[in-house]
Amino acid sequence: MPLPRAYLGTAQPPASVKEFYFVRHGATDLNEKEMHLQGEKHWGVQGAGTNIGLNGTGKRQAVLAGNVLRKLPIGSVVCSPLLRAIQTALIANIGFLCFDIDEDLKERDFGKHEGGYGPLKMFEDNYPDCEDTEMFSLRVAKALTHAKNENTLFVSHGGVLRVIAALLGVDLTKEHTNNGRVLHFRRGFSHWTVEIHQSPVILVSGSNRGVGKAIAEDLIAHGYRLSLGARKVKDLEVAFGPQDEWLHYARFDAEDHGTMAAWVTAAVEKFGRIDGLVNNAGYGEPVNLDKHVDYQRFHLQWYINCVAPLRMTELCLPHLYETGSGRIVNINSMSGQRVLNPLVGYNMTKHALGGLTKTTQHVGWDRRCAAIDICLGFVATDMSAWTDLIASKDMIQPEDIAKLVREAIERPNRAYVPRSEVMCIKEATR
């Protein structure tokens, strides 16, 4: 609900305001408190007189905001002096060595009500022992003069955001006012608009252990929203905790196309988009040409290593095309580039996976969707436990691969790298 004109009093937006960004601080414990008194809903009150820090949810929101902000053309940063706003700016790690503090970006002062509970009227109108709404609006309008410089980022509070929106004649939804949202205010021909920017959504298969788990952990730490697939959802819950606003789990069976379709549908329903797919799940049990070829095992290897990535690619491509910068990362193997052993099943299927990557790149190029092969040598996981060519401590670590995957996702369209070969033993280069 927009603030009424009477709330603003004589406050007016400054002249020559250019487009700017706004982030409401991450959540605090008071943000999450509410109660009913005599049948009326009351909310936790934290204004200029309450200087508390972010809770766990708020810190996570700041990390996600940072993922978005680091990709935007931020010109300068201006922050409220209150701890919850400063923490948000610091945790977001926007890339600025310093930023300005402006007292006028403080939240409205709620006087003796600070730290308690208040009814809707307290936030919508003048209320006993609270800062006058006109005086509050006047100082917010003064702070808005920073936006005379293009692409200024404000890190502030919900009340400040509502005043800015009212000054500019912009209607806000509940989604706009959520903690940690990155908002872009732009002036059109005759009016202002506001757009929400959210962090990318990445699907990762086989993410409950090994390389897949390391990939997911790294993406979470860098502010991505994830939809993770594994045979048993409970394994994902053990690995990453309960699902939440930014983390989604789904059953993924590489032999069951139905689970794949259901996963992609559920991810889109939750997040509204898909920005990237990491085909990580693989099967490495030996199918040896020197011995009797186990065709049942080979069939399973073919299905998991080739058919499942193909089906996931097919399902995700329409959504990836919509982003203009979709990414598919296939976790391949150096066995898809050369042959060092008689393990014909693994060698064949990994060569075939490379063919899928190349074909996907051919199909996706004009839609700005890139496919990348990351070809691994020996990685310190169960899949490499059989070799005596190199000690586990000298093998590639899962965390090394996770960083390469994130770099592949973040690399701009103008700098396509089709394949990364990752080695830990001396080999001839190709």
Swiss-Prot record:
Protein name: Agropine synthesis reductase
Ligand binding (NAD(+)): 203-227
SMART domains: PGAM
UniProt family annotation: Belongs to the short-chain dehydrogenases/reductases (SDR) family.
Chain sites annotated for binding substrate: S333
Function noted in UniProt: Reduces deoxy-fructosyl-glutamine to mannopine.
CDD domains reported in the protein's UniProt record: HP_PGM_like
One Gene Ontology MF term: oxidoreductase activity
InterPro entries: His_Pase_superF_clade-1, His_PPase_superfam, Mas1, NAD(P)-bd_dom_sf, Sc_DH/Rdtase_CS, SDR, SDR_fam
Residues of the active site: Y346 (proton acceptor)
Pfam families: adh_short, His_Phos_1
Pathway of action: Opine metabolism; mannopine biosynthesis
Gene name of this polypeptide: mas1
